[in-house]
Amino acid sequence: MNKLLSLATYKQNMKSKLLLLTSLLALPVCAQDDIKDQFNPVMTAVVSQSIAGDARAAAMGDLGAATDPDVNSQAWNPAKYPFTISRSALAINYTPWLRQLTNDIALLNAVGYYRIGDYQAVSASLRYFSLGEVITEAGDMTIKPYEMAVDVAYSRMLSETFSAGVALRYIYSDLSGHYDDNVKPGSAFAADISAYNQSYVFIGQRECQLGLGINISNIGSKISYGDDYSYFIPTNLRLGASLMVPINEYNRISFSADVNKLLVPSMPLKHEGEEEADYQERLKTDYYDVSSISGIFKSFGDSERGFKGELEEIQWSVGAEYCYNDKFFLRAGYHHESEMQGNRKYYTVGAGFRMNVLNVDAGYTIATEPSNPLDQTMRVSLSFELDALKDMFGY
């Protein structure tokens, strides 16, 4: 929650470089005496990389590591593309973000893939996150901060049931709109490593599709905004499973679950009685100066709350999808995050309709707390199957 509210703070004021950075890198301060009880969520830069961009995945609780492959697999598990039925497709996704707080923050992304033969595929996506307009304190200038990322991926079947993929990504973040010379645009390079297994199992007399997936995303450099500090990007480990059960010739239902953990170290908290200068020095040495790769390994055992704290860093999602005749879809899900890591808990619902060429999907978020800025978030996705488009025009 603190991550989301920090965006609203950014919209309200822009007094200094610190405010620019903390709008996306919130540093929570709590008054508890026991350091183990302090609110200390894992913080990252470029939070747009952690937002579910497509309506189908969002309607199922923000999951997609092992769901039936589709055009939007790039963000969830690129290794799924060789198992797609259509040879090629394009998608455009739009998400108005934090509409409970403001009306001009939005995420837009475009995705496409092409399957080469029967065993491999290439894919790419472009993600643009607009932070709206910010009027400077002097009122003499309006800036438009934004984040963007472009990535390409290659995936290949290594057996009849197993595939692997790798993606390369460039991330760019401009928080100041070139207004403050002391705050520079930041950039980072990252890679994803993913794998997917699709097999069939019998449950009674029904042959069901079982999907298992893993995606380690955003393994790469840290990002800096022109000062002496560098910030972690959201390196993430995602594991998923999905079971598709045919009911009869026209109906089927899928059940899916994902767990994910940020592979980013927790920020050290100030100890009772510790001098501020000593704390800042320790913070720089034990956090800001830690490399991204070292941070991955450190993230598994650095919580001030011990093993319990490490478990609290795990988010999980469950979702279901009902399909009628490959034309109509109904979806629902739930996403859970610990209170100590942000308390993002919400239900999701959605629907989809597939025509010969065009697929239309929508997703809607219902937060467990009405005050949650994610409440009533709507996502819309349009996708086009290029094979069907070629057939329509006789190519």
Question: How should these model regions be labeled?
Answer:
Residues M1-M14:
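N-terminal secretory signal peptides that target proteins for export/translocation
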Residues K15-L21:
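Sec-dependent signal peptide recognition
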Residues A26-P28:
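N-terminal signal peptide c-region/cleavage motif recognized by signal peptidases
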Residues Q32-Y395:
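Subset of outer-membrane beta-barrel
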